[in-house]
């Protein structure tokens, strides 16, 4: 009886350890973790070049939602399945949480003409505040640093998160050249270019982030 209890106790500890295990970048590369594209976090963003951002209410209430929805609505252009070389069934996109989170973003007071950057620490602090529906696997979020009309470029921190703990397991600043017809598509073009840049960096990541 004592031996049975001991075995049960050890097995329970093993299950607890498995449940609390954090995913890492090697788990992504090996296909052991499912990946959820969470979308775009605009709460840290500034909008550089006042002439390019004349309707802050529309940016917050319309475009932030639209930019995120494009990730699910147009997977051929915005899916991360191919850039991250994911297997069938390993990838999904779920942007609802970011759409809700972005309601706290302040656009009007963050339209500027000066240069602006954020730190990795700011990225981590923002991620720590997320309320996430998915609790298993690795989440990918673009913590947007700036939409820079002067440079015609979108700057974002591509951030990989262990969904269970909300721990940032890797983040890197990447830029995407904006381009497209109309305000929404112009900046969505920057997201598309960031996706392409991820594809070009994947091989290097898989070798160095072990």
Regions found by a protein language model. Name each.
Residues 1-26:
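Bacterial Sec-dependent N-terminal signal peptides
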Residues 6-9, 104-111, 175, 179, ...:
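Generic alpha-helix detector with strongest preference for long hydrophobic helices that associate
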Residues 9, 38, 141:
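Residues in well-ordered beta-strands of folded domains
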Residues 17, 21, 58, 181-183:
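Alpha-helix boundary/interfacial micro-motifs
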Residues 21-108, 210:
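A structural "domain/chain start" motif
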Residues 23-50, 113-135, 147-159, 163-210:
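C-terminal/domain-edge helix-coil "capping" segments
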Residues 89-135, 141:
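Surface-exposed, polar helix/loop patches in the mature regions of secreted/periplasmic/lumenal proteins
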Residues 144:
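Active-site nucleophile-His-acid catalytic modules used for acyl/amide transfer and hydrolysis
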């Amino acid at each position: 009886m004592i031996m049975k209890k001991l075995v049960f106790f050890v097995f329970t500890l093993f299950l607890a350890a498995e449940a609390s295990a954090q995913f890492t970048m090697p788990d992504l590369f090996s296909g052991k973790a499912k990946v959820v594209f969470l979308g775009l976090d605009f709460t840290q963003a500034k909008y550089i070049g006042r002439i390019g951002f004349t309707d802050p209410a529309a940016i917050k209430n319309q475009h932030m939602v639209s930019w995120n929805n494009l990730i699910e609505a147009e997977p051929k252009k915005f899916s991360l399945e191919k850039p991250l070389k994911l297997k069938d069934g390993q990838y999904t996109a779920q942007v609802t949480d970011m759409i809700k989170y972005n309601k706290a973003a302040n656009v009007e007071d963050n339209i500027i003409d000066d240069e602006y950057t954020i730190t990795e620490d700011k990225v981590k602090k923002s991620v720590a505040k997320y309320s996430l529906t998915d609790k298993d696997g690795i989440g990918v979020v673009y913590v947007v640093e700036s939409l820079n009309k002067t440079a015609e470029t979108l700057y974002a921190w591509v951030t990989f998160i262990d969904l269970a703990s909300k721990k940032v397991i890797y983040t890197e600043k990447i830029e995407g050249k904006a381009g497209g017809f109309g305000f929404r598509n112009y900046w969505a073009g920057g997201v598309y270019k960031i996706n392409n840049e991820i594809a070009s960096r994947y091989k290097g990541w898989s070798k160095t982030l072990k």
